[in-house]
From Swiss-Prot:
The active site is at 67 (proton acceptor). It catalyses: Endonucleolytic cleavage of RNA, removing extra 3' nucleotides from tRNA precursor, generating 3' termini of tRNAs. A 3'-hydroxy group is left at the tRNA terminus and a 5'-phosphoryl group is left at the trailer molecule. Its EC number is 3.1.26.11. Zinc phosphodiesterase, which displays some tRNA 3'-processing endonuclease activity. Probably involved in tRNA maturation, by removing a 3'-trailer from precursor tRNA. Zn(2+) 2 binds at residues 67-68, 208, 266. Binds 2 Zn(2+) ions. Its cofactor is Zn(2+). Zn(2+) 1 binds at residues 63, 65, 141, 208. SUPFAM superfamilies: Metallo-hydrolase/oxidoreductase. It comes from Chlamydia trachomatis serovar D (strain ATCC VR-885 / DSM 19411 / UW-3/Cx). Homodimer. The gene is rnz. InterPro entries: Metallo-B-lactamas, RibonucZ/Hydroxyglut_hydro, RNase_Z/BN. This is Ribonuclease Z. The keyword Transport does not apply.
């Protein structure tokens, strides 16, 4: 089974600190590497994390404030240098096309890879293919900003005792999957009679935003919500004026969305530690963590 985990490559907001780099988040899942909001220095963070940049297959830019995209150009250059053979899909708000181009072509280099751009100008399903369904929602920030939801397909799980009792085996099993029913010894057996559906996991990624219904809709029942929490509640006036959230507000969104796990990130440089973020959010949503650089949050597939 391929690795399933979210690795924090950076978790600072506008300014990096001695202990926190600009934000960047790598989701390795179903044989792909999804990189979210690569800030300045992301390429170097891969080295410290002991992860090859070549695992990246898709890059998501929530918006074009520098701390969410300054690492895009250097990451694309690195992937060119490594001559990756797979295409690199890039998703970003369509209104930021000129900034994407500026970052991509900001220096002279030899382009060897195939970059497939997905400028997003609508909410809803962006792509739906074998490994994932990608959805976007418009968040409430100062500029066009997208939140993301990545969902794997549902899978059909057979119940061995019922398969045996129905006398199913061999090629007829594939027929049952394809047609939804088969005839065995003059009896019609439906797929639902001998199986159940395991819902695919979802992960929601919410960058800069005020609290809004879009976050709740995006994160509904997600396995993990990675959510900005730039400030503590004592600085809620700053959160409001800069269109960000506090740890408490992020926890409220997670509770409303009924997610399984909340990971806070995008911390203001004014805070030296993140313990208070966990304490503040934990009063509302207990299963909460503060992102730490190079920490990985694994989510193995539920066998049931």
């Amino acid at each position: 089974m391929s690795y399933r985990g979210l690795t924090i490559l950076g978790c600072s907001s506008q300014q990096p600190t001695r202990h926190r780099n600009h934000g960047a988040y790598l989701l390795r899942w179903n044989g792909e590497g999804l990189l979210f909001d690569p800030g300045e220095g992301t390429q170097r963070q891969f080295i410290y994390a002991n992860i090859a940049p070549t695992v990246v297959s898709r890059i998501f830019i929530s918006h074009f404030h520098g701390d969410h995209c300054l690492g895009l150009g250097s990451m694309l250059m690195r992937l060119n240098l490594d001559r990756v053979l797979h295409p690199i899909h890039c998703y970003y708000p369509a209104s930021g096309k000129k900034y994407f181009d500026r970052l991509r072509y900001s220096t002279i280099y030899h382009e060897t890879i195939k970059v497939i751009e997905h400028p997003i100008d609508r909410e809803g399903i962006v792509e739906d293919f074998g490994n994932f369904r990608i959805e976007s929602r418009q968040l409430d920030h100062l500029v066009d900003t997208l939140g993301w939801r990545i969902t794997e397909p549902d899978t059909t799980k057979f119940i061995p005792e019922k398969i045996k009792a129905a006398g199913l085996k061999g090629p007829i099993m594939q027929e049952l999957i394809n047609k939804g029913q088969v005839k065995v010894n003059d009896t019609i057996v439906h797929l639902d009679d001998v199986s159940y559906t395991r819902k695919g996991d979802s992960i929601a990624v919410v960058a800069d935003s005020l609290p809004c219904q879009a976050i709740v809709d995006l994160a509904r029942n997600a396995r993990i919500l990675l959510c900005e929490s730039t400030y503590l509640e004592e600085h809620s006036h700053l959160a409001k004026s800069h269109y960000h959230m506090t740890a408490k507000q992020a926890a409220e969104q997670a509770k409303r969305a009924e997610v399984q796990q909340l990971i806070l990130t995008h911390f203001s440089a004014r805070y030296n530690t993140t313990e208070e973020f966990v304490q503040e959010a934990g009063e509302i949503f207990p299963n909460v963590f503060a992102a730490e650089e190079f920490c990985s949050y694994e989510f193995p597939k539920n066998p049931s």
